[in-house]
Amino acid sequence: MKKTKQPVIVLVGPTAVGKTKLSIHIAKAYNGEIISGDSMQIYKGMDIGTAKITSEEMDGVPHHLIDIKEPDESFSTAEFQQLVRMKIKEIAARGKTPMIVGGTGLYIQSVLYDYTFTDEKSDPAFREEMALFEQQHGPLQLHEKLKAVDPDAAKAIHPNNVRRVIRALEVIHTTGQKMSEMQNGHQEVPLYDTAFIGLKMDRELLYERIHQRIDMMIDEGLIEEVSALYQSGLKDCQSVQAIGYKELYTYFQGDCSLDEAIQQLKQNSRRYAKRQFTWFRNKMDVTWFDMTPPCHFSDKKEEIFAYIAGKLGLKAKL
């Protein structure tokens, strides 16, 4: 008798495409609980820059893996995989539907597929050498090093995320294995019965929404939020490598004007959105739904509910 896989709903897409609102509608319709698939929303005190969902927006839907780490703590893909798989079991045991929402492709891929990690080997001297190289030549040159030896990992990791770039280089250095190939047998069949929903939008409109979101973040206190982290002495932590924090750090360090930092933030956010879409399109079996106006939210929601019903056999509570 064939073993039935656990149904899981996954909602992905680039930043500012509208995942948050739709995720709540889906969770309510399918008695779901949401697991954050965002690599930076795990950090406490980093609310505005990560576009963290508010308690009002949650509207009573339980959310997991938000605010579980201090900003000075590190967090790995392997740890994320372990925590999410545990949460999926816990949610299912309560008779609820597990749902993953986010945009960090490698993290989500590690959960859904038979993705195993090499032993956590490290070489402090090599890391120090790469950190010195980055200080002398800048993050783009360091990223080029990674691109030369592991192009797939380079596509998934932003040049500003120096810690992850160095870690990917360190994996190759210590194990001889590419981080992007740490997938057992390149297993392509998901471990779960997955309804994989992707949201997309006309690029120019998406970029406009990204700019509006950043302007809103600044109005809501992003500069003050980043300043508090900077003043607390957090300088080389994984958390402040995130888009929205790294750029403003250059301003606080006196390397550029505030306007230049904001423009760089907008540019990096656009590039990241493009990379997010490319990653999910190329790496996973996503069914895409176009959210470009004049589509009506209610009509698009019904399309997605029909897809979930066909894929998982789940009936929405309307």
Swiss-Prot record:
InterPro entries (alphabetical): Dimethylallyltransferase, IPT, P-loop_NTPase
What is the protein name for this chain?
tRNA dimethylallyltransferase
Keyword Zinc-finger part of the UniProt annotation: no
Q: Indicate the annotated site residue(s) for Interaction with substrate tRNA.
A: T104, R127
Q: Which HAMAP family does this one have?
A: IPP_trans
List residues binding ATP.
Answer: G13, P14, T15, A16, V17, G18, K19, T20
Give an example GO biological process. tRNA modification
UniProt cross-references to Pfam families, sorted A to Z: IPPT (PF01715)
Q: Quote the EC number.
A: 2.5.1.75
Q: Does the keyword Nucleotide-binding apply?
A: yes
GO terms assigned for molecular function: ATP binding; tRNA dimethylallyltransferase activity
Organism for this UniProt entry:
Bacillus pumilus (strain SAFR-032)
Instruction: Describe the function of this protein.
Output: Catalyzes the transfer of a dimethylallyl group onto the adenine at position 37 in tRNAs that read codons beginning with uridine, leading to the formation of N6-(dimethylallyl)adenosine (i(6)A).
Its gene is miaA
Its cofactor is: Mg(2+)
Instruction: Outline the segment boundaries, as ranges, of region: Interaction with substrate tRNA.
Output: 38-41
Assembly and oligomerization: Monomer.
The catalytic activity, as recorded, is:
adenosine(37) in tRNA + dimethylallyl diphosphate = N(6)-dimethylallyladenosine(37) in tRNA + diphosphate
| Family recorded in the similarity comment | Belongs to the IPP transferase family.
**Into which EC class is this enzyme placed?**
transferase
User: Which keywords does UniProt give here?
Assistant: ATP-binding, Magnesium, Nucleotide-binding, Transferase, tRNA processing
Which residues are listed for substrate binding in this entry? T15, A16, V17, G18, K19, T20
